[in-house]
Amino acid sequence: MKIGSGFLSGGGGTGSSGGSGSGGGGSGGGGGGGSSGRRAEMEPTFPQGMVMFNHRLPPVTSFTRPAGSAAPPPQCVLSSSTSAAPAAEPPPPPAPDMTFKKEPAASAAAFPSQRTSWGFLQSLVSIKQEKPADPEEQQSHHHHHHHHYGGLFAGAEERSPGLGGGEGGSHGVIQDLSILHQHVQQQPAQHHRDVLLSSSSRTDDHHGTEEPKQDTNVKKAKRPKPESQGIKAKRKPSASSKPSLVGDGEGAILSPSQKPHICDHCSAAFRSSYHLRRHVLIHTGERPFQCSQCSMGFIQKYLLQRHEKIHSREKPFGCDQCSMKFIQKYHMERHKRTHSGEKPYKCDTCQQYFSRTDRLLKHRRTCGEVIVKGATSAEPGSSNHTNMGNLAVLSQGNTSSSRRKTKSKSIAIENKEQKTGKTNESQISNNINMQSYSVEMPTVSSSGGIIGTGIDELQKRVPKLIFKKGSRKNTDKNYLNFVSPLPDIVGQKSLSGKPSGSLGIVSNNSVETIGLLQSTSGKQGQISSNYDDAMQFSKKRRYLPTASSNSAFSINVGHMVSQQSVIQSAGVSVLDNEAPLSLIDSSALNAEIKSCHDKSGIPDEVLQSILDQYSNKSESQKEDPFNIAEPRVDLHTSGEHSELVQEENLSPGTQTPSNDKASMLQEYSKYLQQAFEKSTNASFTLGHGFQFVSLSSPLHNHTLFPEKQIYTTSPLECGFGQSVTSVLPSSLPKPPFGMLFGSQPGLYLSALDATHQQLTPSQELDDLIDSQKNLETSSAFQSSSQKLTSQKEQKNLESSTGFQIPSQELASQIDPQKDIEPRTTYQIENFAQAFGSQFKSGSRVPMTFITNSNGEVDHRVRTSVSDFSGYTNMMSDVSEPCSTRVKTPTSQSYR
């Protein structure tokens, strides 16, 4: 069979089908005669017995044909006499039922005997089973070789008359491919019979005159009929041995018999022996193509050629917008996206776009770790994987081998994603456990919604943020649960170095019940920001080493749940056995508290630099990290309670920190503030602090926070009413050091070292007293009968609206100042013992948020009951605009 160079020279039909032995003169398949004549003109020295094929053609896959072609249609067996007929005398179209004899030794002559609309797909398999022993062996070998490299085109060209009516081999290729993809059913044999014979006669009529006659005679003499029949007999079993391929084309294509070449090492199947040989090189380690300039070897020649360009510094592909050049065209196209800004690759999880596939794949590894189960593992093998398959194909070059590689890559990516889906599931459970900590919450049920369906929704919407706890269920309680931002001080570490989400509950072992109070606005999970997490984490690291527990002042807050005041942990708990609960009613805030997660897009670099700067400074700040040089505390209290407790003998040896340390901390706080404001797009000026005002008792200044707000609630009862008269900032972050009041028996910073807990000398208290005397007395008490004569007499106080707390708590916290005197250092823990929490949980303290003209928010707490003693609120406010003094006469302002 001659695959004429007419294919190479652009002839209409290149291969001869049934009449291949005639040299194309009587080519029954596809107008090969004319093209063969052109081949003779183009290559006069090319031997007639050899097959010319194009080595540049891609490696060809052989396709199986449906079993409907098992029986050779008689129309395809073209006789040699018809093929050898003189070109000037084209044979008349034979009768449809006439059986032609096949050319004897042409390896491709057997193909037309089985050729149907799917016949060319069988070409390679049939060739493998033919082993001619005559002089035609060389020629059939050429056919064999040709079908390895160009079988797709040759087979299509051979059968082009059946599809294209003799209009050319390329047309046949197109139709074959369309049939291959559309799985068109086989056309009736009679129809093919007519088409084949009529097209062959037409092609002979057109092009037969151009082919020399003697070639056909020579070929005819070389092909005896018996051998031809033997070959046909040999091929029948192969054709009939594939009845399993009956059915639609898809089943035939996917059939394993389509890949008859099996690897002995790994049992991989391949369509051709060429592919198998190339594959075996991987097992043997043989690299037949060695680089002449280095020791690298390659299993394919094109890889070597591409590698040699590195040595020759040849970069044929240049960017038209800059001077960069590239070895591969794909690299140039990928580079051009940097100029155009095109980002064609999209992450299905977080909807980010990327210009390069490697960046997308790298992102998917990190994105998959943060995304929760609801976003990725719900359908681990669906859209993400199909998209990745397409993505991998897009990212590679145009060669078929690279596409095969990308198939395996995409499969590997799918496996990885399935694994990450599983790991995400385990990480979610870890998230839940870590953020629940050791909370004993018998009252929290599915309605509480810690681990409810709302979590999945939150996680789908906030993929890059840490796991937010919240519930989107609408329950009876319209409350916000503001979380303590530093739960890790208790001793647990949260995931990825961050504290828990904004609704994580910081509870202690003694806490028996904490009602998860929910907000109807469904925005609980978004009060936090990454900036807060960084602050919390950095402060957590300071206190964790010396964290201790004080079970003497644990409080059961179960009775707080029944009240209408909202349990809000707006501050940081540095207690082990107390639950930080501050009370704010959220019914007036639901409409105003905005979700903050979309504003918390602080880059990881900023957070890392914050932590790095903090860790660098922490060594030099161990002595007193939060001392303030010039504390200014204005106490607005009523006249009855204007006296400040001076009985507590603070250690006079503790001095304020040096100016350099204060300036260093001031610089750090400004740096954090700038980063925070930049990250939140200046949407609010309030940083983390509430300016809390407790009215009816003396206040104790603790100079622990430089450039920060200092909040010490007086030993009053901090039950909070439901009157919230102004708007919270649009997104209120968690304070790094929060207000600890209301439910706390007392604040002790036991996590601080003794050097950390030393207070400033008594002159600071004198400043407090002076500032208190200069302020107006307040008449804004809800209970007029509350009078504090001194802190030692607070056990005798009466409250008209409060519920009495168990007397043992009161007794345990009376007159402990005497125990503090012998101490060389003053600890806040002792302060808690001295002025323990004698509060009435039923009382209400209305919280008022006043926004001045500068957009700064002042928070005023009106205490209605005066039975709470010794409770301190400390809150570190990073945002400097919040340091304006409250102008109301009923408040205690802290700057």
Curated annotation (Swiss-Prot):
Residues 1-44, 63-113, 130-149, 183-253, 377-427, 638-660, 778-817 are annotated as: Disordered. The modification Phosphothreonine is found at T888. It comes from Homo sapiens. One of its GO terms (cellular component) is nucleus. The keyword DNA-binding applies. Residues 130-140, 202-218 have a biased composition (Basic and acidic residues). It is found in: Nucleus. The lineage of its organism: Eukaryota, Metazoa, Chordata, Craniata, Vertebrata. Gene3D superfamilies: Classic Zinc Finger. Belongs to the krueppel C2H2-type zinc-finger protein family. Signal peptide: none annotated. This is Zinc finger protein 281. The modification Phosphoserine is found at S395, S484, S651, S785, S807. InterPro entries: Krueppel_C2H2_ZnFinger (IPR050826), Znf_C2H2_sf (IPR036236), Znf_C2H2_type (IPR013087). Residues 7-36 have a biased composition (Gly residues). Transcription repressor that plays a role in regulation of embryonic stem cells (ESCs) differentiation. Required for ESCs differentiation and acts by mediating autorepression of NANOG in ESCs: binds to the NANOG promoter and promotes association of NANOG protein to its own promoter and recruits the NuRD complex, which deacetylates histones. Not required for establishement and maintenance of ESCs. Represses the transcription of a number of genes including GAST, ODC1 and VIM. Binds to the G-rich box in the enhancer region of these genes. The keyword Cytoplasm does not apply. There is a cross-link at residues 2, 101, 128, 213, 219, 225, 232, 242, 259, 301, 325, 373, 409, 416, 460, 477, 493, 498, 539, 599, 617, 622, 661, 670, 787, 792, 795, 818, 840 (Glycyl lysine isopeptide (Lys-Gly) (interchain with G-Cter in SUMO2)). One of its GO terms (molecular function) is sequence-specific double-stranded DNA binding. Disulfide bonds: none annotated. Residues 379-398, 648-660, 778-789, 797-815 have a biased composition (Polar residues). It holds the Pfam family zf-C2H2. GO terms for biological process: embryonic body morphogenesis; negative regulation of DNA-templated transcription; negative regulation of gene expression; negative regulation of transcription by RNA polymerase II; positive regulation of DNA-templated transcription; regulation of DNA-templated transcription; stem cell differentiation.
